Amino acid sequence: MRCKAQSAAMPVGIASICNAAARPYRADGADPISVIQRTEACVVAAEPSTVMSIAEVEAFAMRVLRANGLADHQAGPIARAMAASEASACRSHGLYRLIGYVGSIRSGRVSARAQPRLERVAGSFLRVDGQNGFAPAAHAIGVPALIEAAKNNGIAALALTHCYHFSALWHDLDPIVDAGLACWAFTVGQCIVAPHGGNRRLMGTNPIAFGWPRVGACSFVFDFATSAVARGEIELMGRAGKALPPGWGIDAAGQPTLEPAQALAGALLPFGGHKGSALSMMVELIAGPLIGEPTSRAAAALDNGDGGPPLGGELLIAMSPEVFTSGLMHDWHEQAECFFSEARKQDVRLPSDRRHEARQRSEQNGVEVSDALLKEFASLLPG
C-alpha cells in the first residue's frame, strides 16, 4: 500500500498555473504567473514562497516542458515524478530539475519526441530502448510488462537503455510495490564520485532502491545514493549558501572541502568508506555494462554541458513473494509485518516514513515552491 498524495492528471477547471482562469494560492496574494512573467515581483519577504497543490505542481511542470517542445508522452511521466517529489519533500528531484530537463531539450541532446520501444529479450528479461529520450517515458512503457512477468514467473528484470535519467528511484518503484511485488532499482548517476582512497571522480552517485509491499500499511521503500549525498542536494546547498558537513566532498586537488562549489568541481565521496565505494562499483557494473550501457565515466565523455540528466540506463528487478513462497507453510506477509512491528517497538523510523508523512501534509496543505526558483523558471518559458 502506498501512502502518498495523488498527482493525477488535472481535471478541467481546477486551479492551475497552466490555466489562465485560475491561479494557486500565495500568502502575499500575488499571482504566481505574474511572478514568473514579472520577475522583479519575486522578492516579497524573507524566504518568500508560493503555495501550490500537487496537481498544480504537475501542471506547471507540464506547461514548461510542453512550451519547450517536449511531447506529452515524454513530459507526462516527468511531471508526475516531479509532483511526487515535491509532495514528498524531495526537493532535489522536484521542480528544480526542470532547469536541467529544459537544458537538454534546447541543446538537442535528447530527442523530444522519442517513442520508447519495449522488447521481450528472453524469458522474464525485458528491455525498453528509450530511443534517446528521457527515462521516465521508458519506465512508463516497461513497468506494466515487468509486473506481469514477475507475477507469472516469480522474478523478472527490466533494463531501460538509451535514455537520460534524472528522477528519484523510489518513484520508479512505487507502482511495482503497489502491485504486491518486492523490487530493486539501480541506475548510474553523473560521474562525480571518487572511490574510497582516491582523489578524483570515477563513479556516479549511483543510487540503490528497494521496495517491499505491505497490506494496510505504508509501503517500505528506501532509495539512497551510494555517495555521501545526492548531487542535487549539494547543488541546493550551494544555492542556499550552506557549508557541507565534513566527509562529503573533495576539491579539484583532492583535498577535503566544505564548499559546495569546490566539491562540484572536484568530487563527492562515497558513504561508509570502502563499503559505499564497493556498492557504487557494483551499480556501475549492473546498471552499465551488464545492460549494454556506459559507465558514468564513459557517459561523462559524451556530456555536452547542458546541465541535464546524464546518459545512463536503469535496471529494475521485481519479485513475487506469492510465487517465491508457493507450496510452503509460510505466511510471508505475516512474517514481514512481525519484523516491522518489532522494529516499531524500538521507536525507530522506517525508511520512507518521512516521505509518507510529507505526502499527507502536502495533500492537505500543498507544497511551498521557492520564489527564487520561480524567478529562475522565467527563462524556461519561451517569449
Model-flagged regions — what are they?
Residues V193-A261:
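Phosphate/diphosphate-binding glycine-rich loops and adjacent basic-rich segments that engage nucleotide
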Residues V51-M52, V57, S296-G383:
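Catalytic-core signal marking the mid-to-C-terminal active-site face
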Residues F125-V215:
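A generic, well-ordered mixed alpha/beta core segment in the N-terminal half of proteins
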Residues R231-G292, P309:
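Small-residue-enriched flexible segments
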Residues G94-I147:
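Active-site cofactor/substrate anionic-group-binding motifs, chiefly glycine-
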Residues S7, G13-S16:
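Intrinsically disordered, low-complexity segments enriched in small polar residues
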